[in-house]
Amino acid sequence: MTLPLQGNRIREIATELTDAEPVMIINTHYHLDHTHGNPAFAPGTRVLSTERTLSHLQALDTDFWTGDAAQLLPNETFSDRRRIVVGSKTIDLMHVGRGHTDGDLVVLLPDENAVHMGDLHFNRHYPNIDLEAGGSVRDWPMTLERVLEFEFEIVSPGHGATTDRDGIRQFQSFMAQLSQIGSDAAAQGTSLADTLQTDRLTADEGYEPISFVVSLGLDRPFVLQRAWEEATGNFERLN
């Protein structure tokens, strides 16, 4: 839900499908493409997220969440897990570790044998790695391993086409390889410039940068830089 306009369309579709107004919003993390549609919904709508997501919205996205929009900030938060029932459907919301940010949640839909991953899964796209909001290249593979302990077959990623458990495993392999490159660079004192030239990142075959109207800069050099920055603790940028 990047913009209220898109939130309006989602609200319309949900109403058409159910003959009722939506009663709940789930924000998987704080980034604008997953939260800025909230104000399109009615004040008083349940808005669920992790505690960390609410903290990030209040600290890192303050300009947007003013006036009427503030009424659609998350109003039900939790630290690790929350089970909710909507009609006959059970939905499990779970924070299982750091990855994209430190507040990501996954949405398990047992009746549909499905999981929505939020941005813990970019299917065949280079991911945004928000170290500033507690994201972690190093922890991401283990977080995905915890997700794979649950029972599901259908996987809805935060970005990219619907996939399956093998799609998560492929992305997990990519993140593990990226983490190892960063760790080795830190141990060997490899510069950022040299790290960006590595030919060791091979699990990204077929990956594409995400773009909307303009490029977001989420590409191979970006993820290598983020891995190097986390591993070395050096956040100086190349010009």
Predicted regions located by residue number:
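Active-site metal-binding motif and surrounding structural segment of the metallo-beta-lactamase
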Residues: 4-48
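Acidic/polar short surface loop at catalytic or gating sites that assists cofactor/ion binding
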Residues: 48-75
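Divalent metal-coordination and catalytic microenvironments
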Residues: 14, 29, 41, 47, ...
